Amino acid sequence: MASSILILKNGEYFIEDYPVKKMIEGFGSPFYVYSKEKLITNFNSFKSHFNGINHLICFAVKSNSNIGILNILAENGAGFDIVSGGELERVISAKGDPKKIVFSGVGKTIDEIRLAINHDILAFNVESESELLRIQSVAKSLNKKASISIRVNPNVDAKTHPYISTGLKDNKFGVNEDEPCRCIRK
């Protein structure tokens, strides 16, 4: 397959087998075009590097929540990293497997936690002790268990801009490296 999805044939541009001119006539300009073939090829190429290793590639829904894109990825075995109940609902409507959904982010509401537990998602990425206690409380009220992972700040400086820094002891996301055991005991 060619590296570009835009192909010039007889003086006319095509994306896959569709003439760009007809797309402009039908949709106007500007517009977004995604190549299903290219998306699948790239996803499978990336996935092939993990052959023989138990893994799950999770697409960050916040990067593109287009239902068609999510559906293509779901059909090809992708998992999903979500940060809201709305993203969870989009993945479910795109036929994504809830058992392949990881719920990240610091702003999870009680309703979003309840929705995710009721859909039996793979795991919550926990960012703080207080969030862990909220998830535990909601799960208990539903008489269910919630799987978690804990985002640990290893106190490593990646030398990025201070406003986007993560991984340091004083960063707002995640727990410090001495806290996970205390959180788990709760």
Residue ranges and their predicted role:
Residues H119, S128-K186:
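Conserved anion-binding
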Residues M1-A146:
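A charged N-terminal "starter" segment
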